[in-house]
Amino acid sequence: MKEYLFLLRGGKPVTDKTEAEKKAEMQAWGAYMGSLGEKGQFVGGLPLVSGGMVVTPEGLKSEPVNSGKEGIVGGYLIIKAENQQKAAELAKACPHIANEGNIEVREIAPMPAM
């Protein structure tokens, strides 16, 4: 199986959710991550702290890191799937989609032997 990076962008801010919505979302995430783990498809991933900086040849920019209309990257997952279509199917089932977010799916290139 190949590895894929899910960049979790946008989504409804946690401050706009009720306690019941937060609890339901956490349960959905637990079920999703559990399913990936049971199938040996979960490699890693974490939420990201808001803010950040961009390093460019001109220096550092500490303004909010924004990825355009798709929204700020708020977290990532690394999963295993047979191909990009199967990875996209896993992304569609992710609770982040139900949270008004979107997911960029990118294949991770294997490192060549040194």
What are these regions (language model features)?
Residues 1-114:
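Conserved, structured core segments of small domains
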